[in-house]
Amino acid sequence: SFRSMYLGLSAFLSANKDRRDLLLSQRQPEFDVSFDPRIAVAPDDFSRITLKAQAAKDYFLLVGPPGTGKTSRALRGMVEAFYREGKQILLLSYTNRAVDEICKTLSAITPEIDFIRIGSELSCDIPFRSHLIENVLESCSSRREVHACIERCRVFVGTVSTFSSKTELFRLKTFDVAIVDEAT
C-alpha cells in the first residue's frame, strides 16, 4: 500500500549513513570471522549454510533453485540455531502458501518451537490455524496478558504484506533476526 511504501521510504531516509550505504550496495555486508574455523569443518552444506547465516552481521542471502532444501532444511537449521541462541525470529514469505510451508517446517522441529502466525483463517492451512494470533490470544483477558503472550513467543510467521500492514506489532516486539523465504 501507499502507506507502507511511504513508511519504508521514511525509514530508509532516516537511517544512518552506514545503513543506507549497505542497502545501496555502497559497502559489503560484514561477517563475524570467528565462525570461519567452524564453517571450514562443517559436516555438510546445510550446517555450513546455518553457520554462515549466524556469522552474518548485516544480512545473508541463500539462493538456489526450487527443491534444493532451502525451506525444509536450511531455514529449519537457521531457526533451530537462532532459537537456541535465544533470538527473537521473524519469518516472512510473499505468499500464504509459502508461509504455510514455513509453518510445516516449524511444526516438524523437536522439541517443539512455539510460533505465532499472523494472517487470516481464510489464507491459513487448517493444521496451523491454532497458531494464528487471534486464536493464540483469545484466552487472554487483559492487555498485560496479551503483551506477555507476545513477549513469550520468540517466532512469528507471516507474509511480507501482512507484516507491512501490521506495524503496531513492531511497537510490541523487537526481532533480532528476519528470514525472508522465497525472496525472489
Label for each model-derived stretch:
Residues 1-51, 55, 107, 112, ...:
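Pre-ATPase regulatory/linker segments immediately N-terminal to the P-loop/RecA-like helicase/translocase core
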Residues 63, 92-94, 158, 178:
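Generic beta-strand/beta-sheet core signal
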